[in-house]
Regions:
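Single conserved hydrophobic/aromatic residue that forms the stacking wall/gate
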Residues: 1-13
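Conserved catalytic-core segments of large NTP-driven translation/proteostasis enzymes
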Residues: 7, 15, 31-34
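Structural motif
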Residues: 13-15, 17-21, 70
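ATP-dependent carboxylate-amine ligase
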Residues: 23-28, 34-188
């Protein structure tokens, strides 16, 4: 499986190329498509049917939607929900960009007694993956920015984060926004 054009992938199965279209970003989503293909192939054994069904299916855009944003920057909107694993997958995606990478992250809710530790792990992971800046919003996101270090900035209110983004974002930035549903991160 490899990328061909924007939002298109090409699969080579049994010496046949199949064009598929998907709005989904990230290696983990491509793996999900491949596992769906294997299931479909075992049940139907018609390679072309899978591509037709996938290409005609409108996947509800709620995860990792890529678009142009403030001042010509690139936005990856992954505001639908967050947990430690999905946040790390999003960080993996963001880390593949060569541009200046900015993670805007809100609290990951409903994590129980290990919530602070799990938030810190996400900050450490972002640092290890080479993310340039982490902007945190929410009480628990402070753990992420502290674990990230010097270029981790915590915001305790919506207006200060919005103001920072408007003032500091450039066309060379790739910004990924992520947070639990309850944080309503899409407002940024």
């Amino acid at each position: 499986l490899h990328n061909t054009l924007r939002r298109q992938r090409q699969m080579c199965i049994r010496d046949r190329d199949i064009q598929i279209k998907t709005s989904l970003e990230g290696e983990h989503n491509i793996k999900n498509i491949l596992s769906s293909f294997v299931t479909h192939y075992c049940l139907d054994n018609n390679i072309n049917n899978f591509a037709l069904k996938l290409n005609s299916n409108k996947i509800k855009n709620v995860r990792q939607i890529k678009s142009k944003w403030l001042k010509g920057s690139t936005l990856i909107d992954d505001t639908y929900n967050a947990n430690p694993d999905s946040s790390k997958k999003s960080i993996d995606l963001l880390s593949k960009y060569k541009e200046n990478t900015i993670l805007v992250i809100g609290d990951m809710l409903e994590l129980g007694k290990f919530k602070k530790k799990l938030h810190r792990e996400v900050g450490e992971y972002a640092k290890a993956k080479g993310i340039n800046v982490v902007l945190g919003y929410g009480k628990l996101a402070k753990e992420i920015t502290e674990a990230f270090g010097r270029k981790g900035i915590f915001f305790n209110n919506e207006d200060s984060l919005k103001s920072y983004l408007k003032k500091n974002i450039t066309s060379k930035d790739v910004i990924l926004i992520k947070g639990s549903r309850g944080m309503k991160m899409e407002r940024f």
